[in-house]
Structure formats: structure tokens, C-alpha cells
Amino acid sequence: MSSTFSGDETAPFFGFLGAAAALVFSCMGAAYGTAKSGVGVASMGVMRPELVMKSIVPVVMAGVLGIYGLIIAVIISTGINPKAKSYYLFDGYAHLSSGLACGLAGLSAGMAIGIVGDAGVRANAQQPKLFVGMILILIFAEALALYGLIVGIILSSRAGQSRAE
């Protein structure tokens, strides 16, 4: 029986696993960060409702993490087309490592943003001078996810380089 598939038949599994890992882990980080910092905003809003809109920054920053995972998942999934060109294990592993790099970086950044955001908005309600410090810490936590996104893009661009075509 003839097949139009070219390459290693198990390789797309690893590629799609990388796309799923990028999205799932990044969204887990985004969900945790949103929930944890959202609880802080809600509890702070009871005493100081005028600060709610100012304190929504950690929630927004946590939500962006899911977008990073979506970007990598789309890049990976568009690179998996075994019928158009050969797709080997090297390509699958490159896409898997790309998804894991972005996803796990997003998960860790989401945990950091959630914890810092929760404590930061509560502290900001008591001492408004802490707002700038909280934002700086949140930016450094968000940078962790950006590192994962950059490494994920670099790793996914390596797919297809194992052969001379």
C-alpha cells in the first residue's frame, strides 16, 4: 500500500505535543496568575474601590501569557505538514522543545505574577508608594515568559534544518 507520507511517522506526534504543551502550560500560568491576583484585587476593592482599575495591571499581565503560548502553538502547527514536505524526528523534537520552553516559562511567569500581584495590590491599598515597585517586579516576572517565547521561536525555526533540500 502506497502512502504519500514522507518522513518519520511518529514525528508529527511530538510536534503536535509541543503545540499543545505551549498552549496548555501558558494558559495554566495565565489562569493561575489571573485568579491569584484577581482575588487580591477583589479583596482590596472592598476597602478601597477607587484603586480597582489601577490594580488591574497584574490581571492583564497574567492574561498576556496565554497569548505567548498561542503564538508558539500556531507557529508549530503551521510547520507540521508532512504531506507537503518531509517531517522527521528532529523536526518533531524541535517543535516539542519549542512548546515546552514557551509553555513552562509561561507557567512559571504566571505563578510569579499571581503571587506578586496578589501581595502587591493589597500592599498598594495600604501604601500607594509601593505601586511602582510592584510594577517593576511584575515586569521582571513577565520577562520570564518573554524569554520562553523567544527561545521557542528560535527552536521552532530549527525544524527542517536536519536535512539538505
From Swiss-Prot:
Keywords, alphabetical: Hydrogen ion transport, Ion transport, Membrane, Transmembrane, Transmembrane helix, Transport, Vacuole
InterPro entries listed in its UniProt record: ATPase_proteolipid_c-like_dom, ATPase_proteolipid_csu, ATPase_proteolipid_su_C_euk, F/V-ATP_Csub_sf
Pfam families: ATP-synt_C (PF00137)
Cytoplasmic-side positions: 34-55, 118-129
Location(s), subcellular: Vacuole membrane
Keyword Transport listed: yes
TM regions (residue ranges): 11-33, 56-76, 96-117, 130-155
Membrane topology (UniProt): Multi-pass membrane protein
Family statement: Belongs to the V-ATPase proteolipid subunit family.
Assembly description: V-ATPase is a heteromultimeric enzyme composed of a peripheral catalytic V1 complex (main components: subunits A, B, C, D, E, and F) attached to an integral membrane V0 proton pore complex (main component: the proteolipid protein; which is present as a hexamer that forms the proton-conducting pore).
Name used for this protein in its record: V-type proton ATPase 16 kDa proteolipid subunit
Species the sequence originates in: Gossypium hirsutum
Name of the gene this protein is made from: CVA16-2
